[in-house]
A protein has these predicted regions:
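Beta-strand-rich recognition/accessory modules
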Residues: 1-18, 28, 106, 118, ...
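Acidic-aromatic substrate-binding/catalytic surfaces of carbohydrate-active enzymes
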Residues: 21-76
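Active-site/ligand-binding surface loops and adjacent short beta/alpha elements
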Residues: 142-225
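Hydrophobic residues positioned within well-ordered beta-strands of beta-sheet architectures
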Residues: 13, 23, 99-101, 119-121, ...
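Short acidic/polar mixed-charge low-complexity motifs
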Residues: 19-21, 31, 40-42, 115-117, ...
Length: 278
């Protein structure tokens, strides 16, 4: 089943399976706001968001495009997350539903970034699983399209002190807080601000949150995985986060941080992230 609804003033589409799994997608930014599976909310969404229709939304799954963070001249994490996308038809598949949400270059985007493009996020819901697939088309006739970005997924956890992430062991690691390069431990634990970029692992990651386990996979077309938690001190400085918000979330992002992805004229690129309750 699919329904249209207004959530905090934003136009949204909700997909619901017969077993109770649901996903809520806002047209602002093609932003996944909620994913409920096996009776539990799996994504963290800050209660302190402004919900004004153009400010970035803290939580859920922001689509960062065509720039990661502040690594360029565009607004932080690019313009896609603050821009209105267009919803397509909801499609019923074997065991699930999906919807495609599309952003095309227009006068506003071209004023910031002189590049013709089409970006599409497919949100696919099946029992116990959410698959997000970002496709970027270069609609220029001659020039290459270069971009960085991420699916900046905020996962909900009961208590960050009792949470660990496995699967990145021995992968090259950049600790952005200390600006130190190294290799990852077999299991990551979170005590204070944590902001690290890893060479993407070929195998699934496992998030252990008390008695709950979530598998996290990404396509090899993403170069990196980013793991982020602001910790108590930094969280207290974020106006769109409650003081204890850090204790209930962990970002695990499919990302392209350093070297831009290059799409030839008329070509396209596909990158996905899959979350599975296990």
């Amino acid at each position: 089943m699919s329904t249209s609804e207004i959530y905090q003033g934003l136009a949204c589409h909700r997909l619901t399976l017969s077993g109770g799994d649901t996903v809520l997608v806002a047209m602002q930014g093609a932003h996944v706001l909620s994913w409920v599976s096996q009776g539990r909310e799996r994504l963290y969404l800050s209660p302190n968001n402004r919900w004004d229709g153009h400010s970035a939304i803290r939580g859920g799954v922001p689509v960062c495009f065509p720039q990661f963070n502040q690594r360029g001249t565009l607004p932080k994490h690019g313009f896609a997350r603050n821009t209105l996308w267009q919803a397509g038809e909801v499609v019923t598949t074997e065991g699930g539903l999906h919807i495609d949400v599309t952003l095309r270059a227009d006068a506003d985007t071209l004023a910031m970034w002189p590049q013709h493009f089409e970006a599409q996020l497919r949100v696919a819901l099946t029992p116990g699983q959410l698959l997000l697939t970002l496709t970027v088309h270069n609609t220029e006739a001659q020039q290459d399209l270069l971009f960085t970005g991420a699916l900046h997924t905020y996962l909900a956890v009961d208590d960050i002190d009792l949470t660990d992430l496995q699967g990145l062991g021995l992968r090259p690691e950049w600790d952005a807080v200390a600006d130190v390069h190294g290799v990852a431990d077999a299991a990551l634990y979170f005590d204070g601000e944590f902001d690290r970029v890893y060479d993407a692992a070929p195998q699934p990651l496992t998030l252990q949150d008390g008695s709950s386990t979530l598998q996290i996979e990404q396509s090899p077309s993403w170069g990196q995985s980013v793991v982020w938690n602001p910790g108590a001190e930094k969280c207290a400085t974020l106006p769109d986060m409650p003081a204890d918000g850090f204790a209930h979330m962990l970002c695990v992002e499919a990302a392209q941080v350093f070297e831009p992805i290059s799409i030839p004229a008329g070509g396209h690129w596909v990158g996905w992230q899959r979350l599975t309750v296990s």
